[in-house]
Amino acid sequence: SSAVRGGSYNMIFLDEFAFVPTNVAEDFFSSVYPTISSGKSTKVIIVSTPNGMNLFYKLWVDAENKRNSYNIIDVHWSQVPGRDEKWRTETIANTSEEQFRREFDCEFLGSANTLINPSKIKTMAFYNPIQSNAGLDMYEKPREGATYVVVADVARGTNNDYSAFIVFDVSTVPYKIVAKYRNNEIKPLLFPNIIHDVAKAYNQAYVLVEVNDIGEQVATALQFDLEYENLIMASMRGRAGQIVGGGFSGGKAQLGVRTTKAVKKLGCSNLKQIIETDKLIITDYDLINEFSTFILKGQSFEAEEGHTDDL
């Protein structure tokens, strides 16, 4: 991207763009687009085999729904002379059904062994936020009388993982996402202020912070420095695990929840159940992208190599 900045180009051709790592693709595209957007006859041509639900997928779906100005062209294998059902059968026998669907049927397939069923992920439709600013995407403005919950994950702000939180409307079932924050540069010292401001705007939302690593620092700042009252606590019950609430259910109480193997296993199971039974509606692109690469590794689920699972 640094080689392109400051240049002037009439046409930029991006080949197999879907195979560029997501973080690199987003940075590159944000650098490239301004170099050609000022001309009247300039063009961006993107050609690629589908490869999961990444930036190429987002550009394609936005074009299908007339949310951007790209013209899409889909070249199916059946349009190539000499390719018939016999060729299809032989190709699948020499490769695999999944590879054929991606390479020749032009299907956007996520990774294998994902937590959420791939067929369910494929039905998730994302929408553009009504307002975006400095990492915060808002899909719905606060409604009077509605109940909101903010769930936050804290990173160190070193460009690797993202500090993130999601605002859920839990007033009625199905639950829905009304706002999302995601930033890989925000420092833990400043993150509590952002959580505080957004939670306060959403009717003094209940806030649950993951307190592994430096998350405890953020939860402590919310409780004692910013004096935010609606912070969800967890009571430690030994082998019985952790019980979230106001911290009055017995046992040693802590601010937020600490993710252990047992907590993660239960959380993944519950998340899978409420999404696949349509009790939680997902309409955020970044979250859908993370679900498409959140896979089983050993006895637990985590992001595929080169991807993130902060949301």
Regions found by a protein language model. Give the residues of each.
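Conserved P-loop NTPase catalytic core
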Residues: 8, 49-115, 246-247, 253-254, ...
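Acidic, Mg2+-coordinating catalytic module of metal-dependent nucleases/exonucleases
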Residues: 299-311
